[in-house]
């Protein structure tokens, strides 16, 4: 009998019933909520006269629309204010635990879940947000859902899904100096494309993945959606268990021992068969920078902007040409010659304590370049912010000319006051570089925290290995 993949084990252990069309009703262990995709779901419950089936299995956080500046004043934007106040009211009415805008635990939902122990190995977890795949780093089956599905989980704690195919992405070898988890996932997307993972559940494995911290694994799983997959995961090991140990909502005592014994089985069997296997070698991965309007438009920092005329695929060549026109770039331009206007260190991809330490190590004792109009550091949560301030990282950034902000999604997306103006170019640790993602007409270059911090100091990207 063929062994099971990690995805198979997680799926099979949560099937309530199977249907003739190949779909299955899955039990959902945890749902995370935020102010943008939950209002209609709560209103659906209200209109139907229903209550959440398991209220304690839900946690709400305000993150997308919250201002990252002074929070002693009311939220200025009327739409954002209504969404935040609506979440507050809905959570009160339905008795859902919420980390509101003034709660010290508030932050980006995909940072808060793991750090609070709300996300645990072996769980099924959903959220009305595509980057829910982040939580798969803990050996969980985690994926984003739509608002109607948010309501369905609130009402029934179940969801109908079709099982995905499986893909193993194996990264063997050791990472070179200056190469991080962000570079790994950008290199993967550059290799398989933004549609390469469509229809698959991704599992990341190999020596380089096992060597990463939990926060590095979260960065990789976070961007599974940019590779076209709804979910990505890493098998449980000692790193996973030590990360979870002592978290506020983690099991304790005998329950902890029982949980760990169960979690140890959350690995793919040696004889498990994947539908597709992709292999990269760690020593071939260099610091990455995106140059276009899709995460797959990426290259090593020491390369040049590619020429669409040299692309044999006509469709891809047209897409490259459009991207370069939007980005205001000429083919053949060294990536290190592109000047930046703004800097953003934050997002659910790279706003955890290790990310801030990585950036601060580059910034320490230096100053932001004169051509940089604004440099933001936005911690992923109040817990991260407090820890960073305890380590003095805030002073490192402030002394260098950065702004030190309150937790939130911030400049990752143009839904709050932190955004790009038309034509502005930003070096960003976030996950998407689509047209207008950070503000109408804004131009986004994705890179690791260290690379973005170095761009702030030099005014343009540099190879941090030099």
Swiss-Prot record:
[4Fe-4S] cluster binds at residues 348, 409, 412. Its EC number is 4.2.1.33. One of its GO terms (biological process) is L-leucine biosynthetic process. Pfam families: Aconitase. Its cofactor is [4Fe-4S] cluster. Pathway: Amino-acid biosynthesis; L-leucine biosynthesis; L-leucine from 3-methyl-2-oxobutanoate: step 2/4. Keywords: 4Fe-4S, Amino-acid biosynthesis, Branched-chain amino acid biosynthesis, Iron, Iron-sulfur, Leucine biosynthesis, Lyase, Metal-binding. InterPro entries: 3-IsopropMal_deHydase_lsu, Acnase/IPM_dHydase_lsu_aba_1/3, Acoase/IPM_deHydtase_lsu_aba, Aconitase_4Fe-4S_BS, Aconitase_4Fe-4S_dom, IPM_dehydratase_rel_enz, IPMI_cat. Binds 1 [4Fe-4S] cluster per subunit. It is an enzyme of class 4 (lyase). GO terms for molecular function: 3-isopropylmalate dehydratase activity; 4 iron, 4 sulfur cluster binding; metal ion binding. The keyword Iron applies. Belongs to the aconitase/IPM isomerase family. LeuC type 1 subfamily. Catalyzes the isomerization between 2-isopropylmalate and 3-isopropylmalate, via the formation of 2-isopropylmaleate. Heterodimer of LeuC and LeuD. This is 3-isopropylmalate dehydratase large subunit.
